[in-house]
Amino acid sequence: MNQLFGSDKLRLPQRAQAGIAFVRYLIARMNHDRINVNAGYLAYITLLSIVPMLTVLLSILSKFSVFENVGSVLQSFIINNFVPASGDAVHAALQEFIANTGKMTAVGAAFLFVAALMLISNIDKNLNYIWRVKKKRRAVFSFSMYWMVLTLGPILVGASIAATSYITSLRLLDSEAISTVYDQLLRWLPFILSSSAFVGLYLLVPNKKVQFSHAVVGAMIAAVLFELSKKGFAAYITQFPSYQLIYGALAAIPILFVWVYLCWLIVLIGAEVTAALGEREHWRPTEDVIQSLPNNDTELEKDTQRDRFDSES
């Protein structure tokens, strides 16, 4: 018994040292990858592509009569659960932008589709850079994957919303016990959805095998940070509305940009955690932790910068 107790006491410092080494390596890794710069780049691309993405999504849903009212429900759900405060202003701006896209020609519609593909492509490149993936997917495979996301994604989202609406309309929810469970489920639904989305993102996007447990840990950290930032950002907007005095009617634009930037920063932090968990051999409690990073970073950085230049030009 004393031997067991003593071995536990010896194990605790080792675990603490491993945790400290991991945190130091993670911080060095995030600084090395400049995730704050990459988050700003992705936020910029997202703002250029958010209307095309919503337009493509809603236009695909409109082709199916069963999803007739799903578009408005989807917009309201996203605004109410994933955009903190000022949701009405952002919702009105997006509605106006999307309404104007209905007047576009076929050439304009093609441009919207290309812009949506550009967003997915840049997400793919940034996450693969974090995982130090040197071997790129073949162009045909990448295009097929992006096309599947843009076509099947809206259908799956619409089907889930339609199924939820059908379940809500059932008389089973008249029971007080079931109604309480359903209310609790709705309260946790944004967290569950964001966690599931992060797990899928960290498992499927990198062009290498990612351990499921590592993806779950990174996704849970990202989901918690997302919920905390949502509450903190909403509190800042409501308690310190100085931005309205400066920007006036245009206040929704900087609000949306800052929020999108925070979202991408959280996504990249979760990706860094997931990738670092799979690099245990680099958790060294030395002063120069950055030396333990892979040696192909310079080439990857050049490739990423070259891809960004090509996409922007």
From Swiss-Prot:
It is a multi-pass membrane protein. GO terms for cellular component: plasma membrane. Residues 293-313 are annotated as: Disordered. Pfam families: Virul_fac_BrkB. Residues 299-313 have a biased composition (Basic and acidic residues). Belongs to the UPF0761 family. HAMAP family: UPF0761. This is UPF0761 membrane protein VV0203. It comes from Vibrio vulnificus (strain YJ016).
